Amino acid sequence: MSQSLFSLAFGVGTQNRQEAWLEVFYALPLLKPSSEIVAAVAPILGYAAGNQALTFTSQQAYQLADALKGIDAAQSALLSRLAESQKPLVATLLAEDAAPSSTAEAYLKLHLLSHRLVKPHAVNLSGIFPLLPNVAWTNIGAVDLAELAELQLEARLKGKLLEVFSVDKFPKMTDYVVPAGVRIADTARVRLGAYIGEGTTVMHEGFVNFNAGTEGPGMIEGRVSAGVFVGKGSDLGGGCSTMGTLSGGGNIVISVGEGCLIGANAGIGIPLGDRNIVEAGLYITAGTKVALLDEQNALVKVVKARDLAGQPDLLFRRNSQNGAVECKTNKTAIELNEALHAHN
């Protein structure tokens, strides 16, 4: 048996009446755990190889805690707590970063992102949607939709209310981890699987999808769509949009460089380089025709926005007289042409 793993985590979760997993909570996921940890836990769990999600008992949890006592105190303490659980326990061991094949594996991948152990696009999430059941997220936790009506009636008969916060495949991140050094005004707007860097503020209108996020510090008052990563020091204005890889059929990975500003109700469908500004209300798609202006405001040429992807120090604006989309730079016409040629 190989003693190297891509990831290892001990979790407690929720199953429906058919004992199918609805969700899993991993308090302390590990990325590339030491060979000593793997060697200590594998025999107790009966793990041999590959990517597996193995259920274990309270008795095994005590054994695992004892085995890790002199190797990893934090994991040992966690397992001692898990041994007291009334809910089902699962150990997920990933030998490699392959596409997830179970709900427990999918949840571990999402935890790795939100615990800042990996960045967006750095972990394989292929085929994750069918592995995440659509469940009711309630004040008593995850509930299978087929069991919801009965539980709602049961609560009412006891004079109580079963409150449903959302019906979705993804829970909110803060029910699983709150990364250090962040502010999130409305926690329902940040999904598990988001990477929220230290110093990030997500205001009420901000939204961060899974496999997306921020380097931090930064202010997010707009939408960070799936697959989008925002560089440090960048601000997304109220109601602005970043085009995700899940919508529109595009496969271009949209990113926002460092020190950028996307104005209120603006949007981007191209990757932005460092120190770019997009005027409020202006949505730039890859095919948008852009009048490129030099430092003297003279027209250099008209290009498609995709030709400016990743270029630094650009100001995108709309001409208030004729409606043309313009891009102002601090470069000469010669420098602009050289930059475009190098980019192509």
From Swiss-Prot:
Q: What is its EC number?
A: 2.3.1.117
* Record's catalysed reaction(s): (S)-2,3,4,5-tetrahydrodipicolinate + succinyl-CoA + H2O = (S)-2-succinylamino-6-oxoheptanedioate + CoA
Q: Enumerate the Gene3D superfamilies for this protein.
A: 3.30.70.2010, Hexapeptide repeat proteins (2.160.10.10), Trimeric LpxA-like enzymes (3.30.60.70)
Q: Which pathway is this protein engaged in?
A: Amino-acid biosynthesis; L-lysine biosynthesis via DAP pathway; LL-2,6-diaminopimelate from (S)-tetrahydrodipicolinate (succinylase route): step 1/3
Name the SUPFAM superfamilies on file: Trimeric LpxA-like enzymes
User: Which residues of this protein are catalytic?
Assistant: 221
Q: How is the cofactor bound?
A: Magnesium ions are not essential for catalysis.
Q: Name one GO biological process term.
A: diaminopimelate biosynthetic process
Q: What class of enzyme is it?
A: transferase
Keyword Amino-acid biosynthesis among UniProt keywords: yes
Residues annotated to bind succinyl-CoA: 223, 238, 241, 264, 279-280, 287-289, 304, 317-320
- Tell me the subunit arrangement: Homotrimer.
Q: What role does this protein play?
A: Catalyzes the conversion of the cyclic tetrahydrodipicolinate (THDP) into the acyclic N-succinyl-L-2-amino-6-oxopimelate using succinyl-CoA. Displays succinyl transferase activity with L-2-aminopimelate and succinyl-CoA as substrates.
What is the name attached to this protein's record? 2,3,4,5-tetrahydropyridine-2,6-dicarboxylate N-succinyltransferase
Q: Which organism is it from?
A: Pseudomonas aeruginosa (strain ATCC 15692 / DSM 22644 / CIP 104116 / JCM 14847 / LMG 12228 / 1C / PRS 101 / PAO1)
